[in-house]
Amino acid sequence: MARQCELTGKKANNGYTVSHSHRRTKCLQKANLQTKRIWSPTLKRWLKLQVSTKVIKDLKRKSIDALLKI
């Protein structure tokens, strides 16, 4: 399974680690993903998804069905 949010598609970002002398080395900035069990009222079952923490925050305001339509 790829390290990617299953709802938003967020994934790792390529970036640089910059030292004090301004030497740059490549690094991979991974998305903050968590495995979460989410109840879907329309499907009437639990969904086990790997989602970003932003989605978890949005789930407190909206239902999973509203987020899936986006």
From Swiss-Prot:
GO terms for biological process: translation. This is Large ribosomal subunit protein bL28c. Belongs to the bacterial ribosomal protein bL28 family. Keywords: Cyanelle, Plastid, Ribonucleoprotein, Ribosomal protein. Pfam families: Ribosomal_L28. One of its GO terms (cellular component) is cyanelle. It is found in: Plastid, Cyanelle. It comes from Cyanophora paradoxa. The keyword Metal-binding does not apply. InterPro entries: Ribosomal_bL28, Ribosomal_bL28/bL31-like_sf, Ribosomal_bL28_bact-type, Ribosomal_bL28_sf. The keyword Transport does not apply. One of its GO terms (molecular function) is structural constituent of ribosome. It comes from the Eukaryota.
